[in-house]
Regions:
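N-terminal pro-sequences and low-complexity stem/linker regions of secreted or lumenal proteins
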Residues: 1-307
Length: 307
């Protein structure tokens, strides 16, 4: 969703993310063209960067000393959510993302005041309320409801488009077979660890035994990116959204890139987003906005934190 390609990676383990897409990410294109953007996250940016710099092992050790009695799995779970944010997926791009990080609390304030930047990404806490198993999905729904509510009733509502979506299907069955897709590039699926010399992998095997087994199994799968995955929900929230609009057009996550590129006349990152369908057809920009007056939405089953 940020680069239009997986750049051949078949996992997101830290030692693989030192790679970087040849054409960069949408954040690189926005920055080079002077277009403001912010990645909002549930953790204060200073703490977030410290966590990423220390790495999981060092941070866990520090937490064990400072908070005796806490269980190791609980710490790992917390740090997983605390360290993950969209703009920092590739560590090589972390330095350029630093000044674009803000807290979720700041997003609510900016949305209320109508001072959101031209482009924003709002991340959940991937450890506690991203609706992933085994989380309480009501927390994720409550977070999404809170984000939508602040956009709906914020001073910038008349000029805002929010796309609420998910990065994966979550394990639910889909009766529709995924169709073929345009390959983003010519980079085949591979794992950087499996490309290491055999002697190095043998040396590190005691430390990475489970990961190496998992990667070996994954590496036996498809190596091309020429097919979509299972469908995921996507909701358009805008004054100009077409009421009750349904479409059979095939979209994917790079459709968001396509929309951003259309708005600011930016070049495509890969063949995939160049061929993507833009979700503009879900908007009616010619007439009066159907939702100029924000609708009242039902409250979520679980009120927004603290939990």
């Amino acid at each position: 969703m940020i680069a239009g390609t997986a750049n051949g990676l078949i996992d997101d383990l830290p030692w693989d993310l030192v790679d970087y897409p040849a054409a960069g990410t949408i954040f690189d294109h926005l920055t080079s063209n002077g277009i403001g953007w912010v990645n909002y996250h549930n953790v204060n940016p200073t703490r977030l960067l410290l966590k990423r710099s220390l790495g999981a092992a060092g941070l866990i050790a520090a937490r064990r000393i400072a908070q005796l009695g806490r269980l190791f799995p609980a710490i790992v779970h917390a740090e997983r959510g605390n360290k993950s944010f969209t703009a920092g997926l590739y560590p090589l791009g972390l330095a350029g993302a630093v000044r674009h990080l803000r807290t979720t609390k700041q997003f609510f304030a900016d949305a209320d005041a109508g001072t959101l930047p031209p482009f924003s990404i709002v991340d959940p806490d991937f450890g506690d309320f991203s609706e992933e198993n085994p989380q309480d999905i009501r927390k994720g729904e409550s977070f999404a409801s809170e984000v939508v509510k602040h956009v709906l009733h914020g001073k910038g509502w008349a000029d805002t488009l929010l796309i609420w979506t998910y990065d994966e299907h979550g394990g639910y069955y889909d009766h529709v077979p995924p169709p073929a897709a345009v390959p983003p590039d010519d980079v085949l699926g591979r794992d950087l660890v499996l490309a290491w010399p055999a002697w190095l992998r043998a040396l590190l095997r005691p430390l990475l035994r489970a990961a190496l087994t998992e990667l070996t199994n994954a590496d036996a799968g498809p190596t091309s990116y020429d097919r979509y995955g299972f469908r995921v929900p996507a909701v358009i929230v805008s004054p100009y959204a077409r009421p009750g609009y349904m479409t059979s057009t095939v979209y994917d996550h790079t459709s968001i890139l396509k929309l951003v590129q259309q708005k600011w006349n930016l070049p495509a990152l890969t063949r995939r987003d160049a061929a993507a369908q833009s979700p503009l057809d879900a908007l009616d920009l010619d007439g009066e906005p159907a939702f100029g007056q924000p609708p009242d939405l039902p409250a979520p089953s679980l009120a927004w934190g603290p939990w």
